Amino acid sequence: MKIYDRNRNALTAGQRVMIAATGAVDVLKEAHTDNLTPYQAEHQKCVLLANSREHYAPIELIRLG
């Protein structure tokens, strides 16, 4: 399933993203959206970033570049 950042830009693995709350820049590693509705995929913490130990909701991210 496609996921989108807070500005409705499509997100895919390998893209640089910024965490909106902190301004930290990281790389999207993977998104676990199996068995989620489109609304859940956008708002649940299902995205894993390369250098972070936390999961993020796509709506918390901003795609860079």
Name what the model sees in each region.
Residues 1-16:
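Mixed-charge, Lys/Arg-rich low-complexity intrinsically disordered regions
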Residues 16, 33, 53-54:
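Intrinsic disorder/low-complexity segments in short proteins, especially the signal peptide
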Residues 22-25, 53-55:
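Short acidic/polar mixed-charge low-complexity motifs
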Residues 23-37:
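Short beta-strand-centered aromatic/proline hotspots
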Residues 43-65:
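Intrinsically disordered, low-complexity, charged/polar segments
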